[in-house]
Amino acid sequence: MPAARFGSAALAAAATYALQRAATRLPASITQALGRTNHRGEPVTLAEGPTTALGATLAAVIGTSGVSPRVATAVGVAGLGAAAVGAYDDVVGARPDQRTDKGFRGHLNALREGRVSAGAVKVAGVGASALVAGALLPRARSPLGAAVDTALAATVIAGAANVVNLFDLRPGRALKVGLLAAGPLLVSDRSGSAAVASAVTGAAVTALPDDLGERSMLGDAGANALGALLGVAAATRLGRTGRALTAAGLVGLMAASEKVSFTAVIARTPALNAIDRWGRRAPSTEPAAGVPTAGEPAAEVTAAPTSQRVGEPGPGAGGR
């Protein structure tokens, strides 16, 4: 990895580590709001999400500022915007009156009843920040071409934010997905996308030990932010056709998640299962393969401290 990309990864790792240490000294009220109990009955914290999101975004902004101020601004808007509304859903979505508003159907039902769910706020916030970020990325000069390019970039950014979040259902899974997705984007180019992918890599590697050790959880704040940053990296590098194909793939995965259990698919696929279980603690009460219900968006379970989806291993963020 050339010096610039190594520098972005190292800065993200250092910033994430420093924020992790600072998070241990948060006021009791904040610590309690971020506290959860996992399926083992052990305390975990959602502080991993904000610290990882901030560490990755800071390094990505610095890494791209010398390449393109517009890309650096897009990185900041997408990363911080997704982290902010994700944190809102992590905390507010844990309230008893919000626990039934899960999945897109749950958000729509809440709106029909005259309520705005925390998840709906998050979806709107991620979409809005993705649209602003997309408008800052390279686009055609004609009005119509610019509108198409912006819409495609925004779809890639918002879609990536949501898809990474879909995998935050087991310790380390979303971080591994983020690292695998960042891999191809580390190849050097002049757009600045490699610096963004490097920042995500450094932050994810730093967060991985505590996540695998079930001491902390990524939650919506972290998963949405890392996904949004990867979306910016991809949209910055790709042309219109590449953005369209990537957007279609992400939308397809989101649609599939409403019908298919990603956990069950991973459990039935030996190679994916091996990667998924690498580094994790020995299972205690995890369900057998194929038990989880269809449609398990992490955004809908990350903030529920006392309830769980049928077939998922237990209460707490990420359904863990």
Give names to the regions the model predicted:
Residues 2-264:
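"…together with the soluble PPM/PP2C metallo-phosphatase catalytic core" -> "…together
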Residues 239-320:
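C-terminal membrane-associated helical module and adjoining short loops/tails
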